[in-house]
Amino acid sequence: MEPLTHPLLDEATVSQLRATLLADETSWQDGRKTAGYQAAEVKNNLQLDRNSKTAKENSQLVIKQLESDPLVKSFALPRHIHGVMFSRSGIGQGYGMHVDNAYMSSGRSDLSFTLFLNEPESYEGGALCIQTLQDSKQVKLPAGQVIIYPSTSLHAVETVTAGERLVCVGWIQSYISSNEDRTILFGLNAGARALLAEHGRSPELDLIFQAYTNLLRRLGS
Ligand SMILES: [Fe+2]
C-alpha cells in the first residue's frame, strides 16, 4: 500500500499548535520511555508527556482533524486513532530503523502517521525514511501536512544536523487490517465518489455504493 500525504492543518492552526507545544517548558521527556524493546535502542528524541494537559488537549485536536477529513477516512477507514505523541529532535537526534509494535496498550497499529509541525527549511536531516523493497522513500513535508503509511513498514528518522524537527506521530487501528483489502476499498470508494461528483446520483451508482458498503461490512473487524 502506498502512503498518503495530505494537508491536514491550515497555517494559523499549525503555528498556534507549535507555539503552545514549545511554550510548555516542563513536560518534554526522553523518548526512550515510550519505545518498545526493539525500538528503545534506536530511539533518541524528546517527547511531550502524554499525561500533560498540553499533550491531552492538542492530541485531541489532531485526532478530530484526522477523523473529520474525508480523504483520510476513505484511505485509512479509522476505527480508533491512538498513541498520539508530540516529538522533537534536535541536533544529533533521530530514530534508527525499526518497525512499530503491532499491538500497543492503546490499540492495534495498522497505519502510522507523522504530522509535520515545522517548516522543512527550519532544520536539516530529520526526514522520515520508509523502507520499500529495494529503496528507501524519504519524506519531509511542509508544516501542517501528514503522511499516513502502513505500520508494517520498516522506517527511520534521519539524524537532525541543524535546527529542530517537531512532529506529531500516532497510529490508526483501521476497520480493515489488511493493507491489500484497504487499498482495494480505497480505489472503489474514490472511483464512486468521483462519479458522484461528476454525474450526481444514479441507480447504477447506488449499486456500486451498496457493493462497497457490503464489502466493508464483510472484510471489516
Ligand atoms: Fe516508528
UniProtKB/Swiss-Prot annotation:
Q: Which PROSITE patterns match?
A: FE2OG_OXY
GO BP annotations of the record are: DNA damage response; intracellular iron ion homeostasis
Molecular function (GO) terms listed? 2-oxoglutarate-dependent dioxygenase activity; iron ion binding; L-ascorbic acid binding
Q: Which UniProt keywords apply?
A: Dioxygenase, Iron, Metal-binding, Oxidoreductase, Vitamin C
The residue ranges crossing the membrane are none
* Residues reported in the UniProt entry to bind 2-oxoglutarate: 165
Query: What sequence ranges are listed for the domain Fe2OG dioxygenase?
Result: 80-174
Identify one Pfam family in the record: 2OG-FeII_Oxy_3
UniProt superkingdom: Bacteria
Q: Which NCBIfam families match?
A: PRK05467.1-3 (NF003974), PRK05467.1-4 (NF003975)
Q: This chain belongs to which protein, by name?
A: PKHD-type hydroxylase PMT_0286
> Species name for this entry?
Prochlorococcus marinus (strain MIT 9313)
Question: Lineage of this protein's species?
Answer: Bacteria, Bacillati, Cyanobacteriota, Cyanophyceae, Synechococcales
